[in-house]
């Protein structure tokens, strides 16, 4: 087993691989490394808001980093809806609080993985962008002293907003790719747009700490712009989502100047076809019409380096396109092929032990994205190949029937099932690393009257301590309370505990966190009155059936449950005292919202635009909800002075946020007493000012 001291060596090696040394830009320099031995994980699936919380990924960083060199996560910027998977982005620089966690949690997660030698790939969505409160009012943001203030000139002139009577008309060039009708298509021919995207990618890598990009919907704009962006960002890892066949994908790679890899959709489609028909000859294509090779981009040695293979992803995992065969066998095939394999999160969670073993085999043999393959047998019943890595070779058989490779015995079998077998003479190494961990004696939950939680460190270096916080901040050697292993912490009110193991000045474990409640805290839900003539609330929870809360579908008509707050009409409902977590749907008997899950405390919502028969909601609790320690209006004054909103306060201002009356954030600044409002229309806005001591003031201001 690897020992803890190996971490520093691993991290150093990976850092050198990622950063390299200064040199001329060779072919593929900013694309994907040659002979790359790494394995990637897609760290999310559709609507996987729980599994992909930044805090959850950070807690699992030790285990995940043992097996994966790269993890692809959703776009982390704040989007136009909540919840959102990240594909309707609004903010690039100033707001990375998303459906997956806060910006602080994001930075903690990236830093934790980087310390274990695993890089995080950002889902970069720059084909399109949404406005803050309208279709076209992009936020004004500042990065490295440059202010980016975009208008209709940044939008392709043939975007659908051109046909909207109440919206500004786009004046950019015609789109250089396919249209996306969910947001505004950006004009990539415009150098100001290009400069904004270059700055955004610089922020992702040099500020947040991402190591590369997964470009969403690259069919939406010309491939030549990927070259511009990657050469500016000096991206060592770039992969594009070009959903198409072999010829068009390879054409796209060439048009980027080979500055990006691409997902191997042909690999996925051939895998689907082979397993659905139980015809394993479909796993083979002929290179140059003569040499049998694994099907997909990877069948050509020219493109193996630029191929990221996958079995399913968040988009394909649906009835019409998802892989329906044996997942373990498909992963055995993928992990014994060239290209960089990308394991799907759902497959990982459901087949973890098997996939761990298969990754260990790949890494022990030294298979890379450019390893050579000799197909030994290809029939309807089976696929057999010899794969040569940097440390030796293996034989893999996929399918039915027996096969006895020459020179191998049963003792050389390192993995097998009824539908696959792998032989190798290379010793298979253990990838599990023994790392320090911190455990909490009680799981998150409700403990009426209070609870004692024991903090314990295991596998810790001599003299190590535990650092913990209860104020939501990140524990470290310099932040938090330092205690010895075995310390008992008494909790007598709702508290989130975060803890790490500290050795000297270094954090040497992942963060362990838990939230404890000591009394019943019923949920109160406010919905801003929508245009619907009927509004129903339908709710359920783990402990309550829908019939016990608001009745069976469509729930309770809330016409008699309205309140006026801050000049706004709200529908309001409070759960029974013992129900402190609830799921809810707003509907009018015909149209409805998406499921809003795990609602706690007091929450305020507004409806977004209806799409089909469902719509999303935006959580506006930060704007309208009650805030503890609100300052008197006499202590904090806010006024608009022309194009600037000015705050007068008795101490340093930590942050300023400005919102439209619909709840959309339109401007933000940190550690400043003023904020630019030059790009905002005249009208009433809501402000939220946080002072250095945590005091919060909120109210209305006129622009």
Predicted regions located by residue number:
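Active-site-proximal helices and loops of the catalytic beta/alpha 8
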Residues: 27-46, 56-65, 82-89, 109-118, ...
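Edge beta-strands of extracellular beta-sandwich domains
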Residues: 507-516, 592-603, 619, 696-703
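Aromatic-rich carbohydrate-binding modules that target alpha-glucans
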Residues: 474-484, 529-577, 590-597
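C-terminal outer-membrane/trafficking sorting elements
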Residues: 626-703
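Conserved structural position at the C-terminal beta-strand
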Residues: 501, 588, 689-691
